[in-house]
């Protein structure tokens, strides 16, 4: 026959071209069968899988081929023209006859392979050496091809489609690869019920990301292999289809549909033995629909309706609404199973079930308190993700972190190594010196080195011993897990003798060894006075460290109990916010109630309306609160409400609605809280905002949440809401001057508030706190605080100043103004003190002075 491209499939023709390149590469004049076989086992996946199915070794075939090729005559240079050898011509003719006997339209890889197995030049001997003859090849090819015929030039992509584009979950469950599934019995039972229907037997699992949709399918796979399912699902194969792999590389129109049809044909021809699982099932809508081609969902619909294809889908609530609900014909073919987020108690049970898998993988122990902390803290602090996924991630990362510490050099030993290197460098430097002082230093360094090296040796030995103990425990746990898998397999195969031998012999022995080793380590640790270099148990502290990294919450704030942390809050605030004891006490009391769990947990930690004249400490209280509770003044989100005087400006706070410019950017408030959920939010001069803008405050104050422009819930439960206002400030100043009682001032201001704010707004606040006007005594304390800040800045410059009471009284007198509060103090210090100091610093550079005494002479600050 003529060798024409039209007679071959794409892959078989590619192999012949590669054979030509092989012949050229070896400087051979003729293209022969050995070149073709080499190209098949080098480049072609189908040829490799056929040989592997025949239990042949690719490496051995390559070795024998190379030996044969080396002994063939070759030219000195690469030949320009090549000729087809008689054996190759005969093999191609033979493959054409095999094609006709198979009733195929094109010569494909398997035809070439069968023809090569009959080649008398070398291929037959090489394949026979691996116990591969034409009969064995035919049997293996029949298994791979099934009933498919070669009707186009790309048939190889349709062979074993499920193996290529799917993952056998029942096989993975049998091998113990899948994690155990704890709980979720109702959801699995409902899924089995739907799968057992006659028609429309296709469940779709709908739930938020991370609630365990895929885990339910894995749980079903485990039930199938354990026989814990109705007869309709006994011995079925559960295969997860990879839509990404199915679409990837389908460059020609219709290629994707061909692949999908091959998969569906394989599923339907199994007579219900295969159940298909499509994760992210919304991807089938529109998949492959380019240039007018039909999408995947339209190929699935008829088979789903007739019950020929049993398919489990999984998707999120949003994706289901956006993609599947738009296609009612597809939606009605699936029966919905809603998967809700598990409770904290259920999550702890799930974590306890998974604990062993993670212990074996990481080679560490995980304490039960760590599991409880992971569930509770992830639910409290990680608001945008769902249980149990976020809790499992916490355990995984904490265990990974500890494993990394175990394999790395301990910090104590690393410090000693660095000190030794430093002393050795000093020793080399001192050896060049010959004076007596250098010799004494050298002797001291030698003594220090000897001491450090002795300590280094001891710590190294201890580290190796501890590491070895942990590795031994890890190895024993892995062995126990392997034996448990073997026991399960033996029970499934009803090999009860083998199961009993493993369970009461091997497993018992390993468990005893593990217990003895753990007891020995515990005794050694208790007897040993030395502190351990390595930890092998994940504790609650490890969980809090990981959460601190994820959410930027200061670590110490989680490790301390809420009560301990807040006991001295009032004193600390009073030291920074002067003259407002009632206000500070009200704020501290409210936060203490919130943090000790006595107030409503669904509301913000505290919500306060601070009223009073300018400069009395309203904003300062917010900053101080942020610093004390969250370790940084940057944890304060400041929203200036004078910028929100128009009704439409609400979109700047929560984000523009869909279709408007700025929708993707999000809102100033919503995005700030999403990024920093643990912060003090200051709404400054709240009375200046439009009343409609204030309406969004109602749900924040009442329920601790806000829905932004994108429809996402923003959690305000861990924020402190502070609103400041100048309402009633004139009355406060006037009545303070008349020395009225605080209660009377409070009553007057509260009555004025009703003219500015709606009752439903005022009623939702924890406290309405009225700040008094500052007295002269308060101003003196503020002066001292401001002077301390100046001193701290001067200390960096290497300068010191001393002030007597006269200077403090003078600054307080000059800055005293009941209307403006403490703000003039800052200006007085700036103009009268800092300006002169700046000039003195410039002079001191030439005079080399570093200490100044301040005094008041002739109503002026003087430096001595």
From Swiss-Prot:
Compartments it resides in: Cytoplasm
Pfam families (alphabetical): AAA, AAA_2, AAA_lid_9, Clp_N, ClpB_D2-small
Region named Repeat 1: 8-72
Annotated region (NBD2), positions in chain: 562-773
Annotated stretches, region: Repeat 2: 84-147
Coiled-coil parts of chain: 392-526
Record-annotated Clp R domain positions: 5-147
Superkingdom in the source lineage: Bacteria
Gene Ontology molecular function: any one: ATP hydrolysis activity
Function, as annotated: Part of a stress-induced multi-chaperone system, it is involved in the recovery of the cell from heat-induced damage, in cooperation with DnaK, DnaJ and GrpE. Acts before DnaK, in the processing of protein aggregates. Protein binding stimulates the ATPase activity; ATP hydrolysis unfolds the denatured protein aggregates, which probably helps expose new hydrophobic binding sites on the surface of ClpB-bound aggregates, contributing to the solubilization and refolding of denatured protein aggregates by DnaK.
Subunit structure and binding partners: Homohexamer. The oligomerization is ATP-dependent.
Sequence similarity: Belongs to the ClpA/ClpB family.
Domains (record comment): The Clp repeat (R) domain probably functions as a substrate-discriminating domain, recruiting aggregated proteins to the ClpB hexamer and/or stabilizing bound proteins. The NBD2 domain is responsible for oligomerization, whereas the NBD1 domain stabilizes the hexamer probably in an ATP-dependent manner. The movement of the coiled-coil domain is essential for ClpB ability to rescue proteins from an aggregated state, probably by pulling apart large aggregated proteins, which are bound between the coiled-coils motifs of adjacent ClpB subunits in the functional hexamer.
Protein name, per record: Chaperone protein ClpB
Lineage: Bacteria, Bacillati, Cyanobacteriota, Cyanophyceae, Synechococcales
């Amino acid at each position: 026959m003529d060798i024409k491209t039209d007679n071959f499939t794409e892959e078989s023709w590619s192999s012949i071209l590669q054979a030509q390149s092989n012949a050229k590469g070896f400087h051979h004049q003729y293209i022969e069968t050995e070149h073709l076989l080499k190209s098949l086992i080098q480049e072609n996946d189908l040829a490799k899988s056929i040989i592997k199915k025949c239990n042949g070794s690719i490496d051995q075939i390559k070795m024998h081929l190379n030996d044969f090729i080396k002994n063939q005559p070759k030219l000195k240079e690469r030949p320009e023209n090549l000729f087809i050898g008689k054996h190759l011509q005969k093999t191609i003719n033979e493959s054409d006859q095999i094609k006709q006997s198979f009733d195929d339209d094109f010569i494909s890889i398997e035809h070439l392979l069968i023809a090569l197995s009959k080649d008398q030049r070398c291929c037959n001997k090489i394949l026979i050496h691996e116990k591969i003859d034409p009969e064995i090849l035919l049997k293996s090819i029949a298994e791979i091809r099934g009933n498919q015929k070669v009707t186009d030039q790309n048939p190889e992509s349709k062979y074993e489609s499920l193996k290529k584009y799917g993952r056998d979950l029942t096989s993975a469950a049998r091998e113990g690869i899948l994690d155990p599934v704890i709980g979720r019995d109702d959801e699995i039972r409902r899924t089995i019920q739907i799968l057992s229907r006659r028609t429309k037997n296709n469940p779709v699992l709908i739930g938020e990301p991370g609630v365990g949709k895929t885990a339910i399918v894995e749980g079903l796979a485990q039930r199938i292999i354990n026989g814990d399912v109705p007869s309709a699902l006994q011995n079925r194969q559960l295969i997860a289809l990879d839509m990404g792999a199915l679409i990837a590389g389908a460059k020609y129109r219709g290629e994707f549909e061909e692949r999908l049809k091959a998969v569906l044909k394989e599923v339907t021809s199994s007579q219900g033995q295969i159940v298909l699982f499509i994760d992210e099932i919304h991807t089938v809508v529109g998949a492959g629909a380019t240039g007018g081609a039909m999408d995947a969902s339209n190929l699935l619909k008829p088979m789903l309706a007739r019950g020929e294809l049993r398919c489990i889908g999984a998707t999120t609530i949003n994706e289901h609404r956006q993609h599947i609900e738009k296609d009612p014909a597809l939606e009605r073919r699936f029966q919905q199973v809603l998967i809700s987020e598990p409770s904290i108690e259920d999550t702890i049970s799930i974590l306890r079930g998974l604990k062993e898998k993670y212990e074996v993988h990481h080679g560490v122990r995980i304490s039960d308190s760590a599991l409880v902390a992971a569930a509770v803290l992830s639910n409290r602090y990680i608001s945008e993700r769902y249980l149990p996924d976020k809790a499992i991630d916490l355990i995984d990362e904490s265990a990974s972190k500890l494993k990394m510490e175990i394999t790395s050099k301990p910090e104590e030993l690393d410090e000693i190594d660095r000190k030794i290197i430093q002393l050795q460098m000093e020793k080399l430097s001192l050896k060049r010196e010959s004076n007596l002082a250098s010799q004494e230093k050298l002797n001291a360094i030698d003594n220090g080195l000897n001491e450090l090296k002795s300590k280094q040796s001891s710590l190294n030995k201890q580290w190796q011993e501890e590491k070895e103990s942990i590795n031994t425990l890890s190895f024993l746990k892995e062995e126990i897990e392997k034996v448990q898998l073997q026991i399960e397999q033996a029970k499934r195969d009803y090999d009860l003798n083998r199961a009993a031998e493993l369970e009461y012999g091997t497993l018992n022995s390993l468990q005893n060894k593990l217990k003895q080793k753990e007891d020995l380590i515990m005794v050694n640790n208790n007897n040993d006075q030395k502190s351990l270099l390595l930890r092998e148990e994940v504790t609650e502290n490890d969980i809090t460290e990981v959460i601190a990294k994820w959410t930027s919450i200061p670590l110490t704030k989680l490790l301390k109990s809420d009560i301990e942390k807040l006991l001295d809050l009032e004193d600390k605030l009073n030291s920074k916010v002067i003259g407002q004891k009632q206000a500070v006490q009200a704020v501290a009391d409210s936060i203490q109630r919130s943090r000790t769990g006595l107030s409503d947990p669904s509301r913000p930690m505290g919500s306060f309306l601070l009223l009073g004249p300018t400069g009395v400490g309203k904003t300062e209280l917010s900053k101080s609160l942020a610093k004390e509770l969250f370790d940084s003044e940057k944890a304060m989100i400041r929203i200036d409400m004078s910028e929100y005087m128009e009704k439409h400006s609400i979109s700047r706070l929560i984000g523009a609605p869909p279709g408007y410019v700025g929708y993707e950017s999000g809102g100033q408030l919503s995005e700030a809280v999403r990024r920093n959920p643990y912060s003090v939010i200051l709404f400054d001069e709240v009375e200046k905002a439009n009343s409609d803008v204030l309406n969004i405050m109602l749900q924040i104050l009442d329920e601790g949440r806000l829905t932004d422009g994108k429809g996402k819930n923003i959690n305000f439960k861990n924020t402190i809401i502070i609103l400041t206002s100048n309402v009633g400030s004139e009355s406060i100043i006037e009545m303070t001057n008349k020395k009225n009682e605080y209660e009377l001032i409070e009553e007057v201001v509260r009555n004025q508030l009703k003219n500015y704010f709606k009752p439903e707004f005022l009623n939702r606040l924890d406290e309405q706190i009225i700040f008094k006007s500052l007295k002269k005594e308060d101003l003196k304390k503020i002066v001292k605080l401001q002077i301390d800040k100046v001193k701290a800045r001067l200390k960096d410059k290497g300068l010191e100043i001393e002030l007597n009471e006269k200077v403090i009284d003078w600054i307080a007198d000059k800055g005293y103004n009941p209307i403006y509060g403490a703000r003039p103090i800052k200006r007085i210090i700036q103009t009268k003190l800092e300006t002169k100091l700046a000039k003195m610093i410039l002079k001191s550079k030439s005079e080399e002075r570093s200490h100044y005494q301040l005094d008041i002479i002739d109503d002026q600050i003087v430096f001595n």
